[in-house]
């Protein structure tokens, strides 16, 4: 086990260069719009920034997707995160690409520390970092526009501090901060669930190997502390998801025959299809692992099996998990019956951790071979081993450049921004254009935790902004901003009006009149005569979450003070 201070000065510089290399295909077209899910995630980065900059409001609600949906407490939306500053300063298109750059740097650095925690050399630590965080798997997801996957950069940091905290108990604080940053950013859904599954299982296996419960105890403590710090977002989000469950794919599976293409094939692109049962595009499957890395991993298992068997179990478990539902006892079938994991889809995302486990074993195997060869003094053999390491790294670099170069194919378009917001129907995949035009996209891509699209659409495709359900009334004026809707109404009679905005229990009328959901849309009663109706949105349970976050911060601050305070000499 090593200390943070053991990092050589050249290592951070190397990781900065690697991060620039991986992000460069995006940075070379820094203002271009991305393909596929870039449209969706560029939009949900732009909306909170625009809510602050255009309206001076806190980003509680997103009126721009699917007829209106949650924003602040959505698990894949960044607000209370340092990355939000990038969106505010540079805009969402450029800000997300800078986020990729930063996250690659953090991911390489954290991966290096995690490897060093298991006793590998500096060179082997670099090998692990590039074999794992520089893998095809991450390049495919980032090229696809899956911004939540950038927040896997905090996984190795969380795991590292949890593992090291059995010697330095206060490092639980650093683990908690890593988890907090993941949740407050884009990583509160898939990355969070898999990070806790991976780290928890690793701690159990290490505890069994070493006969210690400290790993698991520290993992639980760090998880509670991290989620406590992030409770201002996490708690409202969990309550929302419990009340509005979104379905996963419990029956999804990958045929065993596809594993060769997935792990050892040389054709990895966003636009390829390799097997008939391929449900998703290739970004959900590609997990290239160099055969040379596998050979090094096998070396570690042959020579140090009693010490390294936990990594073999990890690789086997996540391989089986990635295969999906192949029977009642399959890990996927079991886990998707549990809360939290029940909403998962894309079984191939579990292959991420097969790469991690094999890369760790490969780094250990590299060191073992180098140690043996240093004794034998075989120069040729040492050259061959180092060339193998260079080949592993070089292959990932080449694959990643080609894949990430596929991300940007659309130069920016000039879009006129309308003064008044309206819901509208446009071609799917144009949500960001709709946002720039100040139009809500009723036809938008599916997003985790969002309600299905809802709106007032007539049989001939006309989109209404409101509809008088009962009685008679005239809307003299309306002003719709993200968190506030204001209607100037003249009612000929009393009645009820349905708005074109999706209902959520966070909406409330300023004058206390009751609101109800009609076909998923906000409905309110109006009276006879002139009246102004103001509807405001606030994230439900926000203050409860904030109280838990502040209490967690105070508790961890007390722990830090207790550990760091100087002791009196006797």
Where are these regions (language model features)?
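Signature aromatic-anchored transmembrane alpha helix within multi-pass, membrane-resident enzymes
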Residues: 220-227, 360, 366-401
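Membrane-embedded helix bundles of polyisoprenyl
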Residues: 15-18, 106-118, 122-207, 218-237, ...
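Membrane-interface coil-to-helix junctions
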Residues: 18-108, 130-152, 254-279, 324-332, ...
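Transmembrane alpha-helical segments
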Residues: 107-114, 154-166, 200-205, 294-301, ...
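Active-site-proximal, structured, solvent-exposed surfaces of multi-pass membrane proteins
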Residues: 461-570
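Start-transfer (signal-anchor) and selected internal transmembrane alpha helices
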Residues: 1-25, 218, 383-390, 554-570
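Hydrophobic, aromatic-rich transmembrane alpha-helices
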Residues: 2, 204, 289-320, 557-560
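Periplasmic/ER-lumenal interhelical loops and adjacent helix-loop junctions
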Residues: 40-53, 57-60, 216-219, 223-301, ...
């Amino acid at each position: 086990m090593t200390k943070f201070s053991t990092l050589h000065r050249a290592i951070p510089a190397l990781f900065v260069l690697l991060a620039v290399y991986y992000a460069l295909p995006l940075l070379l077209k820094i203002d271009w719009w991305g393909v596929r899910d870039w449209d969706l995630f560029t939009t949900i980065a732009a909306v909170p920034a625009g809510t602050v900059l255009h309206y001076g409001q806190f980003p509680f609600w997103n009126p721009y997707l699917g007829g209106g949906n949650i924003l602040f407490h959505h698990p894949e939306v960044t607000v209370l995160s340092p990355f939000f500053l990038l969106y505010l300063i540079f805009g969402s298109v450029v800000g997300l690409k800078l986020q990729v750059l930063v996250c690659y740097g953090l991911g390489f650095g954290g991966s290096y520390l995690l490897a060093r925690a298991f006793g590998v050399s500096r060179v082997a630590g670099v090998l692990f970092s590039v074999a794992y965080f520089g893998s095809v798997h991450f390049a495919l997801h980032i090229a696809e526009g899956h911004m939540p996957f950038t927040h896997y950069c905090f996984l190795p940091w969380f795991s590292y501090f949890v593992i090291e905290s059995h010697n330095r108990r206060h490092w639980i604080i650093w683990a908690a901060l890593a988890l907090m940053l993941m949740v407050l950013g884009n990583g509160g859904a898939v990355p969070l669930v898999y990070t806790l599954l991976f780290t928890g299982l690793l701690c159990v296996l290490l505890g069994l190997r070493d006969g210690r419960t400290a790993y698991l105890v520290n993992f639980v403590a760090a998880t509670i502390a991290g989620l406590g710090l992030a409770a201002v977002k996490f708690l409202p989000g969990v309550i929302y998801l419990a009340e509005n469950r979104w379905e996963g794919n419990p029956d999804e599976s990958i045929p065993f025959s596809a594993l060769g293409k997935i792990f050892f094939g040389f054709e990895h692109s966003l636009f390829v299809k390799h097997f008939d049962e391929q449900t998703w595009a290739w970004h959900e499957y590609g997990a290239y692992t160099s055969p040379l890395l596998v050979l090094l991993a096998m070396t570690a298992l042959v020579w140090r099996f009693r010490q390294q068997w936990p990594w073999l179990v990890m690789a086997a478990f996540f391989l089986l998990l990635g295969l999906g539902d192949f029977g009642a006892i399959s890990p996927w079938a079991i886990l998707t019956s549990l809360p939290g994991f029940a909403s998962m889809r894309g079984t191939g995302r579990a292959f991420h951790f097969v790469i991690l486990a094999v890369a760790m074993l490969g780094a250990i195997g590299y060191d073992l071979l180098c140690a043996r060869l240093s004794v034998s003094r075989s120069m040729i053999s040492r050259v061959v081993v180092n060339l193998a390491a260079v080949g592993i790294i070089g292959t990932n670099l080449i694959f990643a450049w080609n894949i990430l170069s596929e991300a940007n194919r659309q130069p920016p378009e000039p879009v006129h921004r309308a003064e008044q917001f309206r819901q509208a129907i446009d071609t799917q995949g144009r949500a960001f254009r709709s946002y720039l035009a100040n139009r809500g996209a009723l036809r938008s891509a599916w997003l985790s935790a969002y309600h299905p699209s809802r709106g007032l659409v007539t049989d001939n495709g006309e989109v209404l902004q409101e509809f008088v359900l009962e009685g008679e009334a005239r809307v003299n004026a309306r002003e719709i901003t993200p968190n506030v809707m204001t209607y100037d109404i003249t009612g000929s009679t009393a009645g009820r009006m349905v708005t074109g905005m999706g209902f959520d229990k966070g909406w409330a009328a300023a004058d206390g009149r009751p609101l109800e959901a009609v076909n998923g849309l906000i409905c309110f009663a109006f009276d006879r005569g002139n009246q102004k109706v103001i509807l405001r949105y606030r994230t439900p349970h926000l203050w409860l979450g904030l109280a838990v976050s502040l209490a967690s911060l105070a508790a961890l601050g007390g722990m830090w003070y207790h550990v760091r305070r100087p002791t009196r000499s006797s």
